[in-house]
Amino acid sequence: MKLVIMTKSTFFVEEDKILASLFDEGMDNLHLFKPGSSPMYSERLLTLLPKDFYKKITVHEHYYLNNEYRLGGIHIDNPADIAPKGFKGQLGRTCSDLSMLRQMKKESNYVFLKNIFDCMEFPEEKSNFNLNQLEDAAKAGLIDKKVYALGGMSLERIRIAKALGFGGVVICGDLWNRFDIHNQIDFKELIGHFQ
């Protein structure tokens, strides 16, 4: 099962150091997710990270960064959006509707099935599914190694995702809620949580 870390939706001081430490600890894939932000801030964050990690970074929005920095791919969050014309490379999508999942799997390398549980970072985003629906989707072959669980994922809930047959989990709120970006400067405890 793959572990994907998604950045906090806002930029903060020391973010580059925390991300570099997570890579040093073995993080396989980071999703640079800063919705509605200026691309210059994403560029700045990328320039602060060692180039060795670029192939492990997937970008949401500002898709040109994928080519400019030779990143690991792009991720499309809006189901209605299409890949940039002529795009070649790793492509991921986000889906929140089981009826669309089969088609999205055909059109991408992997799919984040969103709002498995209530979102920790955005409390207004509630779970889209109950356990019975997810079990039925797994039995129907919709949930497999190409589908990653997103939304409310924590270390405790990884077991549920694994039992359902998800190919990976996306951690966001469970990680970033353990660190006060405004007051803490020592992030060793945060890193230790995922060692």
Q: What is each PLM-predicted segment?
A:
Residues M6-S9, I18, D28-R44, L48-Q103, ...:
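Catalytic beta/alpha-barrel core
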Residues V13, M40, E124-N128:
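Residues at secondary-structure transition points
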Residues I18-S21, I57-G72, I76, S96-S108, ...:
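Catalytic cores of alpha/beta
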